[in-house]
């Protein structure tokens, strides 16, 4: 990558020296030790590495990895079958079929499904927003708002087959929070069937053996996030788990406004024996999901998204549940739970606020042979639906995997095996800025931590990410915005510069060094060089020392204003400008500007000479830039003056905010 050139400003008179800060007072030894221990603990948790190490713009291959909609799509839904090169996207009155064949140009076909209802009060209400796409035996099921008359269609070999109005399959408005879950011939939904009544949200079985719904009192203004069916050891014990957040029943002013929950239902629930319970779920229980860090006193109580990663051995209890949470300041945390822990909480916990002996069978217990739940058991669970025990994250500390100042909204996780055989879990998290963070979960090594590898810009034009789907077979990520659909590789090894050291310092388990290139482990038939030492990966390279930066020279007149700019390729490194063994400027990790800039306000004779921009990242040290400032001669001055005039506008405007901030701080 070509670094931005240094810039020059007009000469100025010398400035009076400003007194430096007062001498630093010594801290007591005990306090210094406590601060060191706190810093070490924070580093071990990975919070200091929660920001992305590098920033990458995914340009893709021309014509192959991005396709525009051709119109603005404010609401999209994406359907992708693992291993397929095709992606279905539902939009406004249309269903798009994108095809991304390997190594060939992408294509798009459009199926029009316009509104069939002509009368509507608002133009926006006249649209048919497709909100559901699902593969069924009859074809691809597409359901939409249809001018506030929710309806469905089957797409069969490019033909649209109307199915008429189907309440519960699509909301009346695309802005409504909704979930629809399919399992065989069964359909579960949180969508209300009537537009102007029944406004209390419910979780329903709308197709199956018997229609059921949750009691109106067991949830308070829920926002549904995810639902799944878990097949347990006995078929009658199969569970429906759904994740949501709701208003906090604790009205203490210091209590959070929202709490995050997981609810359980028995899939074989047939309703109750009494008139009050015959049409209701009789096995509903809910538990609080905890995602907090006691060491920093940070609580994250707003669940944003959930991703379930099944265990490769097929053990349902070892399924990992990744939850993305936020707090009122839109900082985020990722907490990981196990289905086994969730199941144990529901099986063994007492009920919150209930102090008598539990009835038999206990609330939430699934019964064999589709037996109805006794009325007493239903009444206790209906009045006390929350279990007392909370669901805590996995691990001995019961803390978040990591937390971050970024606002994450969606998550997908890929389990992969590196070249040396170690298994990694790689998280892909969307931000509210329309980017994707690629984070490696800590391994089993001592002192390992979550590592944020990079931030990816997936679109041609910046926009919010509406949908995301991960294909583990093709190793692709599919994301959509209001403008386009993009196919992003999971590896992206070509973005790492700096030779072998830069490749291994990325700590990207998808990438390795082979035959002078940083390549994907999937593109090589033999084992590639990867680091097995997460603390000092650069030491695995054949040449232990990175190459020195090439010397660049510039001639300047005395008393000139000038700046030297060094691109901060790694945001986890400290960049320093050194001149005659003195550090003139230092830019720490988290520095807001993409460049570390040394501003020379008034060039004196002592300030001519060699300037080195040096990057320090752990034990890895490299020389990023090397400049020599020379006294100006007539010929060189004329050449440089012309060059500076040509670049003055763009360069000066680009660095002016950073220079202003630097001068104010100075």
UniProtKB/Swiss-Prot annotation:
Induction: Up-regulated in UV-irradiated fibroblasts, but not in UV-irradiated keratinocytes. Residues 1-44 form the signal peptide. The modification Asymmetric dimethylarginine is found at residue 135. The keyword Glycoprotein applies. Residues 1-21 are annotated as: Disordered. InterPro entries: Ig-like_dom, Ig-like_dom_sf, Ig-like_fold, Plexin_repeat, PSI, Sema7A_sema, Semap_dom, Semap_dom_sf. CDD domains: Sema_7A. Residues 53-490 form the Sema domain. Residues 9-21 have a biased composition (Low complexity). GO terms for cellular component: external side of plasma membrane; GABA-ergic synapse; membrane; plasma membrane; presynapse. Keywords: Cell membrane, Developmental protein, Differentiation, Disease variant, Disulfide bond, Glycoprotein, GPI-anchor, Immunoglobulin domain, Inflammatory response, Intrahepatic cholestasis, Lipoprotein, Membrane, Methylation, Neurogenesis, Signal. Residues 267-269 are annotated as: Interaction with integrins. Detected in skin keratinocytes and on endothelial cells from skin blood vessels (at protein level). Expressed in fibroblasts, keratinocytes, melanocytes, placenta, testis, ovary, spleen, brain, spinal cord, lung, heart, adrenal gland, lymph nodes, thymus, intestine and kidney. Interacts with ITGA1 and ITGB1. Interacts with PLXNC1. Plays an important role in integrin-mediated signaling and functions both in regulating cell migration and immune responses. Promotes formation of focal adhesion complexes, activation of the protein kinase PTK2/FAK1 and subsequent phosphorylation of MAPK1 and MAPK3. Promotes production of pro-inflammatory cytokines by monocytes and macrophages. Plays an important role in modulating inflammation and T-cell-mediated immune responses. Promotes axon growth in the embryonic olfactory bulb. Promotes attachment, spreading and dendrite outgrowth in melanocytes. It is linked to Cholestasis, progressive familial intrahepatic, 11: An autosomal recessive form of progressive cholestasis, a disorder characterized by early onset of cholestasis that progresses to hepatic fibrosis, cirrhosis, and end-stage liver disease. This is Semaphorin-7A. It comes from Homo sapiens. The lineage of its organism: Eukaryota, Metazoa, Chordata, Craniata, Vertebrata.
